[in-house]
Amino acid sequence: MFDIDGLVSDSLKLLADRVDKNYRISLVIVGPPGSGKSTIANELCERLNSMFHEYLKEHGGNIEISGVSEPLPVDITEPIREVSRNIVEYMTSNDGILPQSVEDLDFECVKFQDDGRDNGNVNGNVKVIGRGGLPNAIEVSPYHDLSKPKEKCDVNIAQIIPMDGFHLTRKCLDNFKDPVNAHRRRGSPSTFDSNNFLQLCKLLAETSNTKIPLSRFQNSDNDDVDAVWEKLAKTFTSDVQDIYIPGFDHSLKDPTSNQYCINGFTRIMIFEGLYLLYDQENWSKIYQVLSGTDALLIWNIDIDEAVIQDRVAKRHLNSGLVNTFEEGIDKFQVNDLLNARSIRQHTLDVKDVVTIHND
């Protein structure tokens, strides 16, 4: 089993080291199917948020919202090319996708402003899309008012950022040159919108590099946990845009838009996914983007194939993807096992990765 206390301790050490330099730190949990990435990420997220909530409870619940010392651009999506309204309407009429682009690993992510024509919801948000189209869209809000959430439970400093929300939809897979194989191999590297996930990492890395005024703490060498919580509580900013990303439930089979929100309270980003250390196509660039913030910690889960076979077969059964446990094993062996071995074969050779076990 994994040592959650050790992961929490390592996370807090990184936070203490970088809180004066980065608005956000990045924690990455990577491993094969069935390795427990989501379970670990959720438990770590809950522990960190609970610790901060307890600090607020013991210290009157006061938080301060300020500006940043090195402001971000008004719109962090500014460098992204804007797409015409005709293209948006074309996507809308094609299940939200660009059929001719679903396999284009070199697709350049584009953006458009949501004017409410398609859903009646005029919010001024900017949608960023990759080759997966609207179902895998990143939505960036121009509004970042942090003054409303006054309850301590609303101030969550840790947020999970799952790669799974960037599964290409079944409609996308239908438009592959070999749709039968695309569906059979769903979960392999090419069946994710790696273009847009990489774009998400770039946007979040930019927010991580934002610095905040900490002059009142500069004469203090105290880096215990309460001192770190105090710095966070006094240095939230509304100048960081809200970023919404899709989630994924295996039983629903396709992504759910805007399931997660990274807002101004988010100071710890917990990335989890299969291919975050993969050395092929767009995945190979993620490490460089996140490590460029100098506020990164990576855990790679090493686990026996027999263990993940049992777990994934049960997950397939519970999600309704198969009718029996034996069918779940068969599905694992013709797809998930291939992905697991590919991950092991194509993991980036970088030094600052901590191996953990979750058998």
UniProtKB/Swiss-Prot annotation:
Key words, A-Z: ATP-binding, Kinase, Nucleotide-binding, Transferase
Enzyme superclass (EC): transferase
GO terms assigned for molecular function: ATP binding; ATP hydrolysis activity; kinase activity
The EC number(s) this enzyme carries: 2.7.1.-
UniProt-listed Gene3D superfamilies: P-loop containing nucleotide triphosphate hydrolases
Cited InterPro entries: P-loop_NTPase
Residues reported to bind ATP: G31, P32, P33, G34, S35, G36, K37, S38, T39
Transmembrane segments: none
Free-text function comment from the UniProt entry: ATP-dependent kinase that could be involved in endoplasmic reticulum membrane assembly.
Name this protein carries in UniProt: ATP-dependent kinase YFH7
Gene of this entry: YFH7
